[in-house]
From Swiss-Prot:
The lineage of its organism: Eukaryota, Metazoa, Chordata, Craniata, Vertebrata. SUPFAM superfamilies: Immunoglobulin. It comes from the Eukaryota. GO terms for molecular function: MHC protein binding; peptide antigen binding. It is found in: Cell membrane. The keyword Membrane applies. Residues 1-17 form the signal peptide. This is T cell receptor gamma variable 3. V region of the variable domain of T cell receptor (TR) gamma chain that participates in the antigen recognition. Gamma-delta TRs recognize a variety of self and foreign non-peptide antigens frequently expressed at the epithelial boundaries between the host and external environment, including endogenous lipids presented by MH-like protein CD1D and phosphoantigens presented by butyrophilin-like molecule BTN3A1. Upon antigen recognition induces rapid, innate-like immune responses involved in pathogen clearance and tissue repair. Glycans are attached at N106. InterPro entries: Ig-like_dom, Ig-like_dom_sf, Ig-like_fold, Ig_V-set, TRG_var/const_region. It comes from Homo sapiens (Human).
Length: 118
């Protein structure tokens, strides 16, 4: 079965947050169930300590999936999420990738990355 995983990288902007303009960098991804997908978050801000990843599904409030602690290079999952489902890696400075494993239909939605203190 094929399904669409819509990816939107956006930065939220309350006063305590660092943000960046994505200039229309919306990406739609379609993958087979059981496969994996990667979502890239490029930032131009310095002194970033935490990268937060959110999933927004239609009719629901956005849900934080995890945050990545830059200083320890460690993901901190929200409670109730399966270890190994999501993880973050950084292929180069100021770029982070969220990898989603073992995709299911319920993984479809809009994904956001943001940065601010934990």
């Amino acid at each position: 079965m094929r399904w669409a995983l819509l990816v939107l990288l956006a930065f939220l902007s309350p006063a305590s947050q660092k943000s960046s303009n994505l200039e229309g960098r919306t990406k739609s991804v379609t993958r087979q169930t059981g496969s994996s997908a990667e979502i890239t978050c490029d930032l131009t801000v310095t002194n970033t300590f935490y990268i937060h990843w959110y999933l927004h599904q239609e009719g629901k409030a956005p849900q934080r999936l995890l945050y990545y602690d830059v200083s320890t290079a460690r993901d901190v999952l929200e409670s109730g999420l399966s270890p190994g489902k999501y993880y973050t890696h950084t292929p180069r400075r100021w770029s982070w990738i969220l990898r989603l494993q073992n995709l299911i239909e319920n993984d479809s939605g809009v994904y956001y990355c943001a940065t601010w203190d934990r």
